[in-house]
Curated annotation (Swiss-Prot):
GO terms for biological process: 'de novo' NAD biosynthetic process from L-aspartate. One of its GO terms (cellular component) is cytosol. This is Quinolinate synthase. Keywords: 4Fe-4S, Cytoplasm, Iron, Iron-sulfur, Metal-binding, Pyridine nucleotide biosynthesis, Transferase. The gene is nadA. NCBIfam families: nadA, PRK09375.1-1, PRK09375.1-2. Pathway: Cofactor biosynthesis; NAD(+) biosynthesis; quinolinate from iminoaspartate: step 1/1. [4Fe-4S] cluster binds at C125, C212, C309. One of its GO terms (molecular function) is metal ion binding. Its cofactor is [4Fe-4S] cluster. Catalyzes the condensation of iminoaspartate with dihydroxyacetone phosphate to form quinolinate. The lineage of its organism: Bacteria, Pseudomonadati, Pseudomonadota, Betaproteobacteria, Burkholderiales.
Length: 378
């Protein structure tokens, strides 16, 4: 399969609190497949998963064909943390992670004895690219009195530099707990999610200035215009979005919680401000309801991501089949880094086990709003 190369610009912070520069990366864009090619690859992948004693673990943002394959073969389609938990607890010898690189690394850290493969090792994340370990470590060293809290969307090396790793599902609770104990915090890398948590908790947080290139593109002014066009629609927003977008939301939540909201709430129409890959699962979970993509650019403007992560798009049927056939693209994490990175991950998991209860929505938006204030994993 031939792949086009797409240039991708992303926020490139040099230090927390500093103005962002612009970084440039690239992503491969797989060619579209004919229906018979798709069907043949799906059948081949199913056979290879059995042969390799492997399980497919896919993120909500990857191609719908990969999500369907994971569901059909006893795998998992989930947010980043549940992907890692599922892989850790599954008895398969090989985990095939369809997502971006930090997800594969986290799976390997939690399952060091398993083989972890990815369709494309170059599938990365703007948050990861925008928070390099050497620069981040220098900033942390300049503020040794602060507790370092990093989001899941970071490299294993950055996690190894942290005191806590959080997903958005538990980030509010952990930061609130640290704040109640009088701790001051360094937060990285997503400035929008960090600002949302800071506003909710009142914590003293120094922010790294990274952003998700998909969510950073959503526009509050255009979203408000779309809301006026569809006044009956409820607005579902991921908290990596800018503050002006979050302010318009009926529900702020993770991928999992936004899907839950689409199912539980009485509305028949939703405007969705997150990666459009989620629409596959939303339509399956809430058939008959209408989902409208939130705008990612203003009048006459050109979107960069157009609401779909270019690196998530690198996961394709063809390279999934190839990695299972050849056994390449294996994820390795240096032992010392993995050992250090496991500590902040385990702290989060232990905290979650002690405190977290599954969010259940009743369908009453006024009653459920407090539930959705505690957002879920990316």
């Amino acid at each position: 399969m031939q792949s086009a190369i797409k240039s991708v610009e992303y926020d490139r912070p040099l230090a927390a609190g500093a103005a962002c520069g612009v970084g440039e990366a690239w992503a491969k864009v797989p060619d579209a497949l004919a229906p018979d090619e798709r069907d043949a690859l799906k059948a081949r992948i199913k056979a290879l998963l059995v042969r390799e004693k492997a399980v497919l673990v896919a993120h909500y943002y990857v191609d719908a064909d990969l999500q369907a394959l994971a569901d059909e073969t006893g795998g998992c389609v989930a947010d980043s943390l549940e992907m890692a938990r599922f892989g850790r607890d599954h008895d398969a010898h090989t985990l095939v992670v369809a997502g971006v690189r930090f997800m594969g690394e986290t799976a390997k850290i939690l399952s060091p004895g398993k083989r972890v493969l990815m369709p494309d090792l170059d599938a990365t994340c703007s948050l990861d690219l925008g928070c390099l370990v050497d620069e981040f470590s220098q900033f942390c060293d300049a503020h040794p009195e602060r507790t370092v809290v990093v989001y899941a969307n970071t490299s294993a090396a950055v996690k190894a530099r942290a005191d806590w790793m959080v997903t958005s599902s538990i980030g509010l609770e952990i930061v609130a707990d640290l704040h109640a104990r009088g701790e001051k915090i360094i937060w990285a890398p997503d400035r929008h999610l960090g600002g949302y948590i800071q506003k909710k908790t009142g914590a003293d947080m120094l922010m790294w200035q990274g952003s998700c290139l998909v969510h950073d593109e959503f526009k509050g002014i255009e979203l408000d215009l779309l809301r006026r066009e569809y006044p009956d629609a409820k607005i579902l927003v991921h908290p990596e979005s800018p503050e002006g977008v979050v302010a318009l939301a009926d529900v702020v939540g993770s991928t999992t919680q936004l899907i839950d909201a689409a199912v539980k709430l009485d509305a028949q129409r939703f405007i969705v401000a997150t990666d459009l890959g989620i629409l596959h699962k939303m339509r399956l979970a809430a058939p008959g309801k209408t989902f409208i993509e939130a705008p990612t650019a203003g009048n006459s403007a050109t979107c960069k991501s157009c609401a779909h992560c270019p690196w998530m798009a690198m996961n394709a049927l063809s390279n999934l089949a190839d990695v299972l056939e050849r056994g390449h693209n294996e994820i390795f994490v240096e032992a010392a880094i993995a050992q250090r990175a496991r500590m902040p991950i385990d702290r989060m998991l232990d905290f979650a086990a002690r405190h977290k209860q599954r969010v259940q929505a009743s369908g009453d938006l006024q009653r459920d709003q407090a539930l959705f204030a505690n957002v879920g994993a990316a």
